[in-house]
UniProtKB/Swiss-Prot annotation:
GO biological-process terms attached to the record: absorption of visible light; G protein-coupled opsin signaling pathway; visual perception
Cellular localisation: Membrane; Cell projection, Cilium, Photoreceptor outer segment
Glycosylation (residues): N2, N15, N200
A family per Pfam: 7tm_1
GO molecular function (one): 11-cis retinal binding
Spans through the membrane: 37-61, 74-96, 111-133, 153-173, 203-224, 253-274, 287-308
Membrane topology: Multi-pass membrane protein
Name under which the protein is recorded: Rhodopsin
Disulfide topology: C110-C187
Function: Photoreceptor required for image-forming vision at low light intensity. While most salt water fish species use retinal as chromophore, most freshwater fish use 3-dehydroretinal, or a mixture of retinal and 3-dehydroretinal. Light-induced isomerization of 11-cis to all-trans retinal triggers a conformational change that activates signaling via G-proteins. Subsequent receptor phosphorylation mediates displacement of the bound G-protein alpha subunit by arrestin and terminates signaling.
Length: 353
């Protein structure tokens, strides 16, 4: 084995010289230069500095403006809530531990950080599944006269939390476990060991199949059908141009969210699967650190995509920030009006950009 396994940790370095120490008790500066921990702390501070305001603003603006409280926006708000969980439960913890060079908060802190990071990522994934299914139901109309309403949105929200909890909770109760990973100042699922009594193998397979592959298959199926339906509707002119444009633009926004999710999380999933299937192989601490912390940037991109692609939301946000006035009133107002009109005939009741 090209690593050192101890009680509730695995360090990717063989302890031939006796310098390897528990990541809960000693700085891990023998793994990488101390400057790397300082850089990691600065990166986490940047994510907090950006992630909290933008996600909080998304929640506040939607609550403040009644016209934004549409059923589909409930799912988008769910993403913002999940991101705030990651910011407060994960990013602050990681910033603090990286400043010390090891997981100074102990086992309890590791469990909490790993739980919030996993929960936030899974809520984001299952929210994208709900959005994809909603787009498929609205645009492809497998059920005649289906309208995505408030009850559907609430059921979708409940579904995302149940599924995310089904992935994040088991390691807290003995099916697998959360351990420090990478530079040993953040925690994740134990892909590294076959520790007796934790059934890591079965949990990792369950997680990859049920909480990564199946959601992605559903998303790709829905958007494959959606693209076909949009082309057919455009060719047959079955709906007004306004309705078609509204549906296309909402769908485009959600597709971009899905692509951004894949860009952020696929490297982490790929590295985790490699480590799981090559346990005992040689790899450095940065091998998991880079994809893990790149994935954490997902807390920023969804609200950014929503703000950039939804002119009605952007108009409301500027109005809120400027104390009820929009300095770009003429151009933003015109766009907002047109989009709101498009939304009124759109069966999704969403005002896209």
């Amino acid at each position: 084995m090209n690593g050192t396994e101890g009680p509730y940790f695995y360090i990717p370095m063989v302890n031939t010289t006796g310098i390897v120490r528990s990541p809960y008790e000693y700085p891990q500066y023998y793994l990488v230069n101390p400057a790397a921990y300082a850089a990691l702390g600065a990166y986490m501070f940047l994510l907090i500095l950006l992630g909290f305001p933008i996600n909080f603003l998304t929640l506040y603006v939607t609550i403040e403006h009644k016209k934004l409280r549409t059923p589909l926006n409930y799912i988008l708000l769910n993403l913002a809530v999940a991101n705030l969980f990651m910011v407060f439960g994960g990013f602050t913890t990681t910033m603090y531990t990286s400043m010390h060079g090891y997981f100074v908060l102990g086992r309890l802190g590791c469990n909490l950080e790993g739980f919030f990071a996993t929960l936030g990522g899974e809520i984001a994934l299952w929210s994208l599944v709900v959005l994809a299914v909603e787009r498929w139901m609205v645009v492809c109309k497998p059920i005649s006269n289906f309208r995505f309403g408030e009850n559907h949105a609430i059921m979708g929200l409940a579904f995302t939390w149940v599924m995310a909890s089904a992935c994040a909770v088991p390691p807290l109760v003995g099916w697998s476990r959360y351990i420090p990973e990478g530079m040993q100042c953040s925690c994740g699922i134990d892909y590294y060991t076959r520790a007796e009594g934790f059934n890591n193998e079965s949990f990792v397979i369950y997680m990859f199949v049920c909480h990564f592959l199946i959601p992605l298959v559903v998303v790709f199926f829905c958007y494959g059908r959606l693209l076909c339906a949009v082309k057919e509707a455009a060719a047959a002119q079955q709906e007004s141009e306004t309705t078609q444009r509204a549906e296309r633009e909402v769908s485009r926004m959600v597709v971009i969210m899905v692509v951004a999710f894949l860009i952020c999380w696929c490297p982490y999933a790929g590295v985790a699967w490699y480590i799981f299937t090559h346990q005992g192989s040689e790899f450095g601490p940065l091998f998991m650190t880079f994809p893990a912390f790149f994935a954490k940037s997902s807390s920023i991109y969804n609200p950014m995509i929503y703000i950039c692609m939804n002119k009605q939301f952007r108009h409301c946000m500027i109005t809120t920030l400027c104390c009820g006035k929009n300095p770009f009133e003429e151009e933003e107002g015109a766009s907002t009006t047109s989009k709101t009109e498009a939304s009124s005939v759109s069966s999704s009741s969403v005002s896209p950009a």
